[in-house]
Amino acid sequence: MRSDMGFEIIERGETLVAGLPVRSPQRALGKLSDPRLDRAWTRVLHHEVGGPLASTYIDFAPDVESYYTQIVGYECATVDDATRGHVISRIPPGTYAKFSSRGMFPDVMLRLWAQVSEAETNGDIERTYTGDLEAYPHAYAVDLYIPIHVDESGAPSSAMGEKR
């Protein structure tokens, strides 16, 4: 279902992402100035990876309103597809708001996270914080999947408690 707000509501199955963890509790989502993140991506990109590039945000911390851990790496079909030494994050099946953008880094990421923030502020989505997923279909594109609450009909629940 395509929203008038520039995102789609979709169902996703379980997604496994293998890669390297970056612990960044003080870095706000969408902010890219983190040398640890840059080093992790450099290390991942120097290996043969088992699937499309991806990144997950896991281990949500309400006290900082962000995630403690980001896994930078690649999607894999099974645990056996992961490169030795990489950790695996599991993004559960469910209903997601899919935000997509094209362009150059870091602007493309800043635009995406601004869209998420706007959708939350406007009450268009209510996030579940069970794990966010960034997928990179090609060098200048990012698809961002945000897990959301839905009502019994499958419509997004707003942050205000209203059903849409």
Which residues does each predicted region cover?
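A solvent-exposed interaction/effector surface
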Residues: M1-R164
